[in-house]
Amino acid sequence: MSEKNGARVTAILLAAGKGTRMQSSRRKQFMELGGKTVLQWSFDTLKDSAIVTDLVLVAPPEETEEVWNRYLTENGAAEEAYTAFKGLSEDESSAKDREGKPLAEKGGCDGAASGSFDHACVVAGGAERYNSVFNGIEAIRWPCDYVFIHDGARPLLTEEMLEKLLAAVEQYGAAVAACPSKDTVKIADDRGFVASTPDRARVWNIQTPQCFEYSLVKQAYETVIGEQTHGTAPQQNEKPKITDDAMVVEYATGHPIRLVDTGYRNIKITTPEDLLTAELFLRG
């Protein structure tokens, strides 16, 4: 794949979320959609992409081996593979697989098929989304120019989106999938009353992938995680809760973020109604 595209692009595919708003005991990324799991749709797009060269798949800590077997071993997706475990207890990190091999050293998956990844691994997710992304960035042990961070709960990713994002991140260093807001948005005060109304023409709904130069996003996450670790981060009421990667880069580096219009079909599966909408899009 690296011969098709001069840039080395690592995709971090996030699949560790709990999905409490789905009102189901099953994680939304593993629910069925059109004959596949929700996660499988975006995994397949990344695997078959002429742009993405490498993959880090971030899974629930208790399901890393299952995800490894289902999405990597079964797809023959890695020539050189590692399983890294971040943020686990000592007992968990010393766990063994069925053959008695330490999971923290598990590797293999020789002989990648054409159209798969040059390098791939599974890592355990963290307490919050940004912790999971940081674990994913820390797992990159190969040459990397750009990082594409994508929610596994967004199944309708396309190669065209990836192409537009690559062009933008190569030019600007930071680019995120987005679409212009269709709705008028209100800013609320603490009591639930309207405080202000931003100009709708300037309001965008943010999606994923969110794409950055590797060195930029690595520096940004190391800064934010370092502040939390050493207790130097601003108090909770002084900064908003981090909900996406662009916020991390904005806060830590001030680097401008380019918005890339990827349309309205790139929805996130959050509620049962979203599954129905995605089914309709897949039917065409």
Task: Kindly label every feature range from the protein language model.
Residues T73-D118, G226-P240:
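Intrinsically disordered, low-complexity terminal tails and inter-domain linkers enriched
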Residues F117-A188, Q207:
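Conserved beta-loop-beta/alpha segment of the NTase-like Rossmann-fold superfamily
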